[in-house]
Amino acid sequence: MDAGVGLRAKPGAWAGLGNPRRSSTARVPVRFAVEKFAQPLVLGSDRRSCGAKLKVSCSRKPAGIDKTYYSADEALVLKQKAEDVVPYLNDRCIYLVGMMGSGKTTVGKILAEVLGYSFFDSDKLVEKAVGISSVAEIFQLHSEAFFRDNESEVLRDLSSMHRLVVATGGGAVIRPINWSYMKKGSTIWLDVPLDALARRIAAVGTASRPLLHQESGDPYAKAYAKLTALFEQRMDSYANADARVSLEHIAVKQGHSNVTTLTPSAIAIEALLKMESFLTEKAMIRN
C-alpha cells in the first residue's frame, strides 16, 4: 500500500461493516469450496506461497479495499506496524473472533492487505461448501448443528495453510475443536460493546442473522437481549484469544465519546499493536 496517498477516514465507518442446497449427509469437499472462492489480497514484491492444501492463489490482483477507510497517517502507521509484526508471525494464519457485526470482515481485509496475506470469511466458505447462498438459509433448511459441523470442517482445512487472515463466525468459538484448529495460528478478539452492536444490527436488519431473526418486537430491544444472552454464553470462549482488541479502549485513547466514530483502520492498527505485544512476549518466553 502507498502510505503517501492522501486518503480520508470515514468517521463511524466501522458501524457499517459487513458482514445453495444439498443433503445433510452428502458433503461437498471444503477444499473445493475454498479453491473456488479464493480472492487473495496480496501486497509487496516478494511473497511466498500461501500454502498448498487448499490451493489458494497468490496472484497479485488488486485487493479491492475501500481506501477511504484510511487517512494518510493511518496508512503509514498500518504499514509500519505490519512490518513490525510480520517477522514474529512466521507465516502463521490470523483468526478474528467476536460477536456478529463486530467488523471482523472489514478489519480482516485491512489486516490481510497490509500483511500481504490472503483473506477468507469462514461463513462464506461454508455457504460455498454446502451450496446454499446464506447462513440464514442453511439454518432454515438444515439446522444450526449442521452449519457448525461444516464450519468446523472449514476451520480444520484452513488450519493446514499459511498466510491467511480468517474472519470467523460469531459462534465458532463455542466448539473446543475449533480452537484446536485456530490455535495453530494467532487469534484476535474484536470486543465491541453490545449496545453498539445492537444498534448497528437493528439499523441494517436481522434477516441475515439467523440467531436474531426469530423474535418479533422492537429491533433494538430484541437484538440487545439476544446479543446479551449469546455473549454470556461465549464470553469465556472469546477470552481464549491470544489478543483482545477493545473498541472502548481505542475510543478512550483517541478521545471519542463512543465507539461508533472509530474507523476500521484504527481498529486494525490496535489489532496489530496487540498482536505484536503478544507475539514478542511469547518469543521472549521461548528464549
From Swiss-Prot:
What are the binding positions for ATP in this chain?
A: G98, M99, M100, G101, S102, G103, K104, T105, R209
Details of cofactor binding: Binds 1 Mg(2+) ion per subunit.
What name does this protein carry? Shikimate kinase 3, chloroplastic
UniProt source species = Oryza sativa subsp. japonica (Rice)
Which reaction(s) does its UniProt entry say it catalyses?
A: shikimate + ATP = 3-phosphoshikimate + ADP + H(+)
Gene name per UniProt: SK3
Q: Which key words are in the record?
A: Amino-acid biosynthesis, Aromatic amino acid biosynthesis, ATP-binding, Chloroplast, Kinase, Magnesium, Metal-binding, Nucleotide-binding, Plastid, Transferase, Transit peptide
Give the function comment from the record.
Answer: Catalyzes the specific phosphorylation of the 3-hydroxyl group of shikimic acid using ATP as a cosubstrate.
Which biological pathway? Metabolic intermediate biosynthesis; chorismate biosynthesis; chorismate from D-erythrose 4-phosphate and phosphoenolpyruvate: step 5/7
Task: Report the domain of life of the source organism.
Answer: Eukaryota
Family matches, as HAMAP family: Shikimate_kinase
Report the locations given in the UniProt record: Plastid, Chloroplast
